[in-house]
Amino acid sequence: MNNIKKIGLSALAGSLAMVSANAVDYTMSGEIASSFQTAKGDTGSTEASNGKGFGTETDLTFTAAGELDNGFTVDMLMGVDTAGALTNSSSQVTLGMGSLGALRLNHIGGSSANAIDDVTPNAYQEVWDGLSDGSNPSFFGSLNSSGSIEYRSAAYEYAGVGISGTLLYDPNSGLGANAPRGVGATSVSGQSATIKLTHASGLEVGGGLEEVDDASGIVGITSATNQVTGYVKYAVGPLSIGYQEAYEDNKAATGTVGGDQSATMTGIAYTAGDLTVSYGEATLTQEAIGATAATEEDFDSIQAAYTIGAMTISAAVSETTGVGGVAAQTFETNTLAVSFAF
């Protein structure tokens, strides 16, 4: 029988009681990204997005990390979006417990479910980036995130396969984090779970499940909802490929088009030194209900990125057909971007 082996097993010194931190390290990092984009739609609502222009966004990330007397670690992350009004765009606190895993409080974003909404390889951005009309194939992980608590297992190895998983509870699904000592008005809870299997050959298989118990009190969600996703990725040398599917079951949306939806995403990327090129496709399907036929929206994108030290130059040519479920409606964008990490 194979023994289960712990990867990176760390000894926990002293009592398990939580006590004061010995030392804290503070760091700040950031990114500046400027882009020029053209956009063109041929019919209907897409014409409102036609045009061209320059844009710049600046993101700052602050982290603090310390170790407790018993060997546990505490990490805090806060991301700040400075593109417009100063906004806290990401914030999490993580208690690392060595071989016991970690507990994370997702104040703003940061859930493991949301992190696997689209894992297909790309050189610049997800295939649907800049093409979405309000819905896109990466809907998985959107129900439970901010204001949630999550357990993340340590990584284990069994028969040469790395195994890890997460469990999340959100007491106010879809509403975001509460103010300090605040409570949610609806108290509609949700749960999420993810699993990931990795192998030294470069193969990775994973998936997740997300649900809202009773969403009748959530604005924009009219019933209990389940979401599920699964993906396969394989990397060998400079080549990486990925395939992912997702499905949303809106249990009480009988007679309503758009109640259930499904998505498929495919990507392939090749890296030669500092240059990466990729091609991706995705399809978002609003499932048929009764006599109403299903509608499809297709996305595709060709991308390239070249890195020179802290600078990355990226380009993307992207298109979607069937915008909003209308087969004759198309929308396309061309993007040239340069970013600096510091």
Feature names for model-found ranges:
Residues 1-342:
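Outer-membrane beta-barrel proteins
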